[in-house]
Amino acid sequence: MQDIMVYDEAHYFDVGTSETPDIELGGVITEMTESTNPKETEKQYIHQKSSITKTTGYANEFPITMDMVKGDKVFENFYKKFYERKTGNDLNIDHYIVNLWESETEANTYKARKITQTVSITECNGAAGEQKQITGSLKGGDFVYGTFNTSTKTFTPNV
């Protein structure tokens, strides 16, 4: 058995354009949680004492906290969306979640998921004498399952 640590899961983001992708490691993220936020329906028939709950979908969300570090492309992308109060598709980003503990046969290749999410940065804060941070969430999207090569920064969907 092997403990899986937070650093065993890498988060990459495409901070480029559709014409020129630029996939970068989220290097200044200090906290991130993956929440499924299941959507459920509940039903009870007259012959039942208890209701039945069915999961009908998910509202994926990743609450995030990042240090403000000039030169980190992921931070600069997220901060620009916050600072300029972007809306709509200008908030979308491709997010790659790479399981570094699940290597594939090809060198530097691991099981991974890709999800297009909305960047929702809600706060920019900091106390006197401390480094500033931004906080918010990455919201929505459906997962595409595949592999990710950390050397070439290429995602390959499963067939």
Ranges and model annotations:
Residues 1-4, 139, 143-159:
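Viral virion structural and adsorption modules
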Residues 49-115, 145-154:
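Extracellular/virion structural assembly segments
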Residues 47-50, 82-84, 133-139, 156-158:
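Generic alpha-helical propensity signal that fires on short helical segments
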Residues 1-70, 117-132:
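Solvent-exposed edge beta-strands and adjacent loop segments
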Residues 32, 98-146:
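Short beta-strand and beta-hairpin "edge-sheet" elements
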